[in-house]
């Protein structure tokens, strides 16, 4: 029986475009970043 491919295929450009800081600075993403700042997260976004 054939196995499917792995679901995580790393790609830095896609990672930045989907989860990056510039994206978080748009609209409601700001709330996410401010919450992570308040919590003291080392990384705010990808």
Swiss-Prot record:
Pfam families: Ribosomal_L34. Signal peptide: none annotated. The keyword Ribonucleoprotein applies. One of its GO terms (cellular component) is ribosome. Keywords: Ribonucleoprotein, Ribosomal protein. GO terms for molecular function: structural constituent of ribosome. One of its GO terms (biological process) is translation. HAMAP family: Ribosomal_bL34. Belongs to the bacterial ribosomal protein bL34 family. This is Large ribosomal subunit protein bL34. It comes from Mycobacterium avium. The gene is rpmH.
């Amino acid at each position: 029986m054939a196995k499917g491919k792995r679901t995580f295929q790393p790609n830095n450009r896609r990672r930045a475009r989907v989860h990056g800081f510039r994206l978080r600075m748009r609209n409601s993403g700001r709330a996410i970043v401010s919450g992570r700042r308040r919590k003291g997260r080392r990384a705010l976004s990808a």
